[in-house]
Amino acid sequence: MSVLISQSVINYVEEENIPALKALLEKCKDVDERNECGQTPLMLAAEQGNVEIVKELLKNGANCNLEDLDNWTALISASKEGHIHIVEELLKSGASLEHRDMGGWTALMWACYKGRTDVVELLLSHGANPSVTGLYSVYPIIWAAGRGHADIVHLLLQNGAKVNCSDKYGTTPLVWAARKGHLECVKHLLAMGADVDQEGANSMTALIVAVKGGYTQSVKEILKRNPNVNLTDKDGNTALMIASKEGHIEIVQDLLDAGTYVNIPDRSGDTVLIGAVRGGHVEIVRALLQKYADIDIRGQDNKTALYWAVEKGNATMVRDILQCNPDTEICTKDGETPLIKATKMRNIEVVELLLDKGAKVSAVDKKGDTPLHVAIRGRSRRLAELLLRNPKDGRLLYRPNKAGETPYNIDCSHQKSILTQIFGARHLSPTETDGDMLGYDLYSSALADILSEPTMQPPICVGLYAQWGSGKSFLLKKLEDEMKTFAGQQTEPLFQFSWLIVFLTLLLCGGLGLVFAFTVDTNLAIAISLSFLALIYIFFIVIYFGGRREGESWNWAWALSTRLARHIGYLELLFKLMFVNPPELPEQTTKALPVRFLFTDYNRLSSVGGETSLAEMIATLSDACEREFGFLATRLFRVFRTEESQGKKKWKKTCCLPSFVIFLFIVGCIIAGITLLAIFRVDPKHLTVNAILISIASVVGLAFVLNCRTWWQVLDSLLNSQRKRLHSAASKLHKLKSEGFMKVLKCEVELMARMAKTIDSFTQNQTRLVVIIDGLDACEQDKVLQMLDTVRVLFSKGPFIAIFASDPHIIIKAINQNLNSVLRDSNINGHDYMRNIVHLPVFLNSRGLSNARKFLVTSATNGDITCSDTTGTQEDTDRRVSQNSLGEMTKLGSKTALNRRDTYRRRQMQRTITRQMSFDLTKLLVTEDWFSDISPQTMRRLLNIVSVTGRLLRANQITFNWDRLASWINLTEQWPYRTSWLILYLEETEGLPDQMTLKTIYERISKNIPTTKDVEPLLEIDGDIRNFEVFLSSRTPVLVARDVKTFLPCTVNLDPKLREIIADVRAAREQINIGGLAYPPLPLHEGPPRPPSGYSQPASVCSSASFNGPFPGGVVSPQPHSSYYSGLSGPQHPFYNRPFFAPYLYTPRYYPGGSQHLISRSSVKTSLPRDQNNGLPCDSGFNKQRQAAVPATGSSLLLSSMTVDVVCEKLRQIEGLDQSMMPQYCTTIKKANINGRVLSQCNIDELKKEMAMNFGDWHLFRSMVLEMRSVESQVVPEDPRFLNENSSAPVPHGESARRSSHTELPLTELSSQTPYTLNFSFEELNTLGLDEGAPRHSNLSWQSQTRRTPSLSSLNSQDSSIEISKLTDKVQAEYRDAYREYIAQMSQLEGGTGSSTISGRSSPHSTYYIGQSSSGGSIHSTLEQERGKEGELKQEDGRKSFLMKRGDVIDYSSSGVSTNEASPLDPITEEDEKSDQSGSKLLPGKKSSERPSLFQTDLKLKGGGLRYQKLPSDEDESGTEESDNTPLLKDDKDKKAEGKAERVCKSPEHSAEPIRTFIKAKEYLSDALLDKKDSSDSGVRSNESSPNHSLHNEAADDSQLEKANLIELEDEGHSGKRGMPHSLSGLQDPIIARMSICSEDKKSPSECSLIASSPEESWPACQKAYNLNRTPSTVTLNNNTAPTNRANQNFDEIEGIRETSQVILRPGPSPNPTAVQNENLKSMAHKRSQRSSYTRLSKDASELHAASSESTGFGEERESIL
């Protein structure tokens, strides 16, 4: 019953059924019954938290201190659950406070653990013990602190709890609180004085656990109590170490601020820095480095912080550590340095950082691998590039590891070599050469690298060129040291067992036994010999294994092993020399054999010349051979050398038996005989033994007798060294003579070469004998050529490297003095001779190397420089072409001499070249005309130079392209003089765009370069000028100015003194001018450029190759032959030390008609051109040109000058673009910083990816970019022109007329012409523009695409110039009288009335007495309108006599035009420049009536096409003057003008005298004009040679007809005809008026003829130029035969015609002006498509008609006139 009742009570308590419980309790008084767990109803109610039930049970007498099975009481349960009211009731009922459960926990403990703050407070108020401990001695405060109950901690501390109490492991409440970051608990404990340094479990302090958990605030609180921050846990980790590993940056900073030690290692040895690096925490690493953490402490496995950073691949961290200068060579236990590790990880950035810091590439790991081994084994080209960027490290390619592998052989073992690509690497840090101020380290290292290349095939001759006394000998010593370090890196061989060892040991022990057998006893001898044999082999075994052991204790074994191996190898070599034929060496492309060098003692050759010095030189080389190969080997080789008759068998044979068999037989006989003697002695009893002994003695004696000669040779060779033989031969020089002595030297040299080759084949090495010739420039001059010939003869075969160190100018001068007449007559000079001998010229230019960094350039694809989209396309083609194999290019046959060899030779050459260079030579061997002169020897020389230059470029961190470098080297090698002109211009001219091609630059200065060797002897060193022009124009990639700036500092084959010579000569000319001559100094390139003209010749023909006339714009005309002034003294030519004078001292002075060629002179005044009738200023033409220049773009702003904002604005202006996408496009442009310069140079595909436009927008944007690029490519060369024209004074009228985009062809009627006056005296013409005091232009600008190409008619015009110069004073006086009278008559014509008669239209052509005019028009044919009034004031001066002396001859036709600011005479147009001088020179003294007027062709442009008017023929003009189609004078003025003109014509002084006088010079002129010769040496060419090789074949037939005298062109669409200008008509003689010269655009200037020009009667452009003196007059031209050819020839020029708006100029009040489009100016607007241009061209060309047959008589007329 009680059980049921009690269960019911418990059930009611569980169900919290209070009424039922009360009812039940009233019936039953037993309330302390238990359930199965021993719990009473009170415990259950206290646990459930039902206060009423608890009260009811307590009221009914429930015992509150009863325990269940786990020793829990009701108070403990209530405290655990936090029922405060029940706890209070239980305490009132007397519950026990200190009762413990089975775990020893009291009610307070549970309340603290559970965080029941109010319960804890209640219990403490009732006196609970706060220091009670439970299991593991844990206090309530520890539980409260560990679980973050801050209030309870505070209560406990207030009630006396121990603040520093600890549990069983010593962990205090502070440690527990800090472990979980309970900040408030930590604060309370610290406030009560908790010990911050007390260690708990695992030796952790509160600071350590707080740091480990990353509780920053707790750490800060603890640090405020000044703890010991350097305490460590059980693993040796400090708080800082833990924070660094975990990456708590703020905590680390706090700890560092608290003074924590940063270098305390943990138990493994890792420091805080290493821990931070391993964790990858960059900021922490930086913080530690700022606190001077030790970066070189080795941690676990000897790894430093730097190594760990490298291993983690964190480049930022590596960079930070490297800034603190760590030791980069500390190895790990595996021997790896950080560089080796970075190389293994292929981390290019880290490798580059380490190399920049000076990490050694020579470091090796435990396997002996260097970083190069690792990189090449891993096939990483970029890593290998970085590791090899210093030339000194190139020697590591040949350093073997412990397995015997070299990086070079590792690379050879792969099918695709990367070492051939490495030498196209990007940059090398020259930190190791900073101390070498002269840059010799780079020179020596690069040369040593080339000469140490295993695949380099000697012989080779290197020329070290520098001025005498510049330190070449110092470089030689450095070069020798470098070559030794490159070569002497082979590991010492270790001892190996071999059959030779067995044979030698047996022979030694047997001999020792025989000795003892003779002297002591046979048995003892056997015992001793066997014991000795055993000892020897025990010793060998110890040495064998000990030499391969690592450690210092075995160094003695290694030393003995290497010494034994060396001596045994030498013995083996001696036996091989005696008994074995040398094997063939393998091809160097499959296995690179190690190289060794032997040097001559070059000091003994200084200041010595002749046979004795050569003997001494070879003797020193033989001494070096003896030191290297050994005394016996070198001297015995003379006896045992292999004869060619031996064949390729392995063994040398004697009597058909191998020699070693006979040798072993003889040795065996000797040993057997000695053995028998030792055993049996000499006893007559032993007959058999005696017989055997006699036989043995006979065999041995016979062998000795038969080899007496050999023994004598051996004895002679051993006693007489090669040095002794050479000296004895030198002492007998008087008997041997020179030829005999040379034969002795040759034999000795060949013997040395064969010896080196033989020993190399046995030892598997490459020996190269280096002959150093120093002091050759100090030898006697007559010995120099002999020395060079001797060296060439002696060392032209075999493994020789000849190094000349000399001053090339002294040597070449000596050669020139000693060359025989045959060579001189063959145009072979000293320079050609040296070029033929020297395979690798190196000019020491330390200044260039020091400035190399200025030219450091970068590009995206290994040096591809993109100028524009077009250039980029060309380079893509280049890259595709360059991938062709060398085998394909050797199929070219006629273009290369390489394919004449057999297949094996060609394959060997192919492999050699491919291995030697990292670029394909296809482009050098393509069918270019310039290659026709390149021989295999020249190609080898080019390869050597390119290789050295490439290494120097890499050493200076200059990125380059191999194709461009090869083109540049070829240019400097074949044409050094002209290339020096290009370089000099680039050095002296600022502001040139980098993309300007060398062809454009050459066209600017071509007329400044002398063309004959008499003017400039240095022209001898250049190749054919025609090939030079073809190379510049047709070679791809096209070289630009940027390439010159890139390559020049490291170009070793170009003599820098050439530029000094050119500058000195130019300065000397100017100095002569300043010295008092009447001529102005001629600057190289001063004066503003002129605007382009449609009449200009294409750029390709504006060259000095075909230029044989006077030099325009600052360069003199060709001077007379050198014999003309050979006896004079003057400035010495720096190169040949010969008298050198400015040619204008001997030839007439020439001034070009263009205003751009002369220096600005203040003596010439100018004003705005005005119309004389209304005084209104005329347009200068420049603004019109600019307006027409960029009509489509709407702005003259160039693409490359646009900013990002301008590009965005330009984008918004594109029609058809999606406006909704515009903000996105603009954002992309700004984000990517796409400015105009980027657009002008970037790759289109990359731009497309970056812009991410939709299809339509992209094509619109792309077309805009390409269009602006095209515009800029036209504008870029003309930028200087714009600059100059903007800054110049108003342009003269003649310039403005020609610059305008459309020029009106003026009317021929004089009534509609504006009257001009021409009143210049001789004195005025002489001094015009020549004021010396005027300042020069400071802007060094050049003309761009247009060129002046006036020329003398003869290719060899010196003779004619001399004869013309020798005109007598009487002739000149007669001419002056005639000219003075002519001026007076012309003044009368124009002076009396205000008529429009033009005074100076007809030219006296006085200038042709001296053959210098380039203007076909009259001297006074043009006059600016602004000079009208001044001309009237100067009429009197114009009549003054001008006394001309012979040296003062002036070209009046051109001297009148001097500056850009003032041009009193009309500047000569492009027709004039291209006009042939021949025709004009033949007519020097004619009056205007007798002078043949130039035939005129009307040119009109219809839609951009060419239209020609028919020219009057004989039939048209054979009648009277009135029969002319268009009268030149109107009605009443006609007769007046004719009368006055007739008076002029009848002047005796003006007519007869000049003709009579000039007939004397007819034969000279005609000879000079007709006898043209084509000479490539003189730098000029005849009119048969055309620079346009691309059109050569198509125009082959037409080219024969283009030499005709006269061309008549007619246009069927035109019925009206126009007469000739009055200025050229004279008396309108129909025969004279019929004569015309048409210029050809594509011809060279030497073939050009003459045409007149004036601003009033603008002559139309003539499209063809012909030399009247070249073609027989009987040839008739039919232009219809080849219209297509002619169109092709004109295509280049015509395709550039753009659409322009018409501009009409009205020089006078003409009632009906005719506006005709002019082609003078090619506008820089949108190009028409080439296809349409070509179609138009073909159509127009087809309209050309045949010339009139009567015109063929012009040649006879010319002769009759003469």
From Swiss-Prot:
Biased composition, class Acidic residues, residue ranges: 1514-1524
Q: Which UniProt keywords apply?
A: ANK repeat, Endosome, Membrane, Neurogenesis, Phosphoprotein, Repeat, Transmembrane, Transmembrane helix
Query: Boundaries of each KAP NTPase domain copy?
Result: 440-953
Under the heading SMART domains, the entry gives: ANK
**In-chain residues carrying the UniProt-annotated modification Phosphothreonine:** T914, T1671, T1676
**Topology with respect to the bilayer:** Multi-pass membrane protein
Highest rank taxon of the organism: Eukaryota
Coiled coil located at which positions? none
Principal subcellular localisation of the protein:
membrane
Q: Where is the composition biased (Polar residues)?
A: 1338-1350, 1452-1462, 1579-1590
User: Which residues are recorded with the post-translational modification Phosphoserine?
Assistant: 882, 885, 918, 1163, 1288, 1344, 1351, 1353-1354, 1357, 1513, 1518, 1547, 1566, 1615, 1625, 1673
Q: How is it modified after translation?
A: Tyrosine phosphorylated by NTRK1, NTRK2, EPHB2 and EPHA4. Phosphorylation at Ser-918 is induced by phorbol ester treatment. Phosphorylation by NTRK2 is induced by brain-derived neurotrophic factor (BDNF) and neurotrophin-4/5. Phosphorylation by NTRK1 is induced by nerve growth factor (NGF).
Question: What transmembrane ranges does the database entry give?
Answer: 509-529, 534-554, 669-689, 697-717
Q: In which tissues is it expressed?
A: Expressed in developing nervous system and in highly plastic areas of the adult brain. Also expressed in neuroendocrine cells, where it concentrates at the tip of neurites. Expressed in developing muscle and is concentrated at the neuromuscular junction (NMS). SNTA1 can regulate its localization in the NMS.
- Binding partners and assembly: Found in a complex, at least composed of KIDINS220, MAGI2, NTRK1 and RAPGEF2; the complex is mainly formed at late endosomes in a nerve growth factor (NGF)-dependent manner. Interacts with RAPGEF2; the interaction is strengthened after NGF stimulation. Isoform 2 interacts (via C-terminal domain) with MAGI2 isoform 1 (via PDZ domain). Interacts with NTRK1, NTRK2, NTRK3, ERKL and NGFR. Can form a ternary complex with NGFR and NTRK1 and this complex is affected by the expression levels of KIDINS220/ARMS. An increase in KIDINS220/ARMS expression leads to a decreased association of NGFR and NTRK1.
How is this protein named in the record? Answer: Kinase D-interacting substrate of 220 kDa
Organism, scientific name: Rattus norvegicus
